Amino acid sequence: MAKSPANNAAQRVRKKVRKNISDGIAHVHASFNNTIITITDRQGNALSWASSGGQGFKGSRKSTPFAAQVASEVAGRAAIEQGIKNLDVEIKGPGPGRESSVRALGALGIRITSIADVTPVPHNGCRPQKRRRI
């Protein structure tokens, strides 16, 4: 016998517990293909996250500043629901969504206390990949 649809509808949905954390860190990973924003508390526990691809942008539109802005608005609203009021922003990567994601977080009413560039730069470490020839 087939299962009744009432069983599927009766599944429990867990609601996120409001944590009331006022200070946090926004980690912005801006690559050439996508932008990922993760908002954590001071200890590094993730409160919310969003990406350009997760907001419905596909292909080359993921790497636009507008897509990064939309993703940071989504992550910022979820963080505000958790009680975030102040953010330190850490930006990693050379992508086009670096500046627009920080502006979007500030426009939501979150106070940005510091902006740091934490892009990893090698001290002549590993050999890079071969040059692309088109």
From Swiss-Prot:
It comes from Delftia acidovorans (strain DSM 14801 / SPH-1). Keywords: Ribonucleoprotein, Ribosomal protein, RNA-binding, rRNA-binding. One of its GO terms (biological process) is translation. It comes from the Bacteria. Located on the platform of the 30S subunit, it bridges several disparate RNA helices of the 16S rRNA. Forms part of the Shine-Dalgarno cleft in the 70S ribosome. GO terms for molecular function: rRNA binding; structural constituent of ribosome. This is Small ribosomal subunit protein uS11. SUPFAM superfamilies: Translational machinery components. GO terms for cellular component: ribonucleoprotein complex; ribosome. The gene is rpsK. HAMAP family: Ribosomal_uS11. Part of the 30S ribosomal subunit. Interacts with proteins S7 and S18. Binds to IF-3. Belongs to the universal ribosomal protein uS11 family.
